[in-house]
């Protein structure tokens, strides 16, 4: 039976790469996006070219009501949920810790932490064998910033991703007996559009001297890690925080 996957924030970057690779691996894919419908539809077109079903679903993950609608739309389009990639996230302009205001922090937490929490709840309710589901796999998108701290640029973002690590471990312990594996991927400096959101166009290149492999990563390399965690090859892995960093942070 064909498996189905829902990916939040899948119109660009890691989410889009994951959707395309999932299709190549035989998954039907729901492509969530917040604003860029054209980009989401381009990803949908690529999934369909691979011979898989795909639907774009608009929802701002930073709004709990929108998350609920997202999953209801998924139910109507696909039915059973087998894999959930909790990927949607935002990153603000680089700033010093003392210059970050509460409104900025709240925006980041609404999407990266609260939104991810609510979305993971919705996925778990559908997968849990205790609640009548058939089990499944959840991959939360964390960041190397969760352990590196984001100093001088993005402490608020790092804080939001540290919470994802904690949530992943707690979920893994609680949901294992209900047929759900929960893991996280922690990307390092990956060359995607979100890096430009900091206002530092060469952010990845500036970090290269700090990376043992002496290069930034690609969205496709992160997608490979996500799909491994989704596969039976990782069937005995839960609660894993998988670094995809080129060795940065060792």
Language-model regions: role of each:
Residues 95-97, 101-107, 207:
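Substrate-binding pocket helix/loop in short-chain dehydrogenase/reductase
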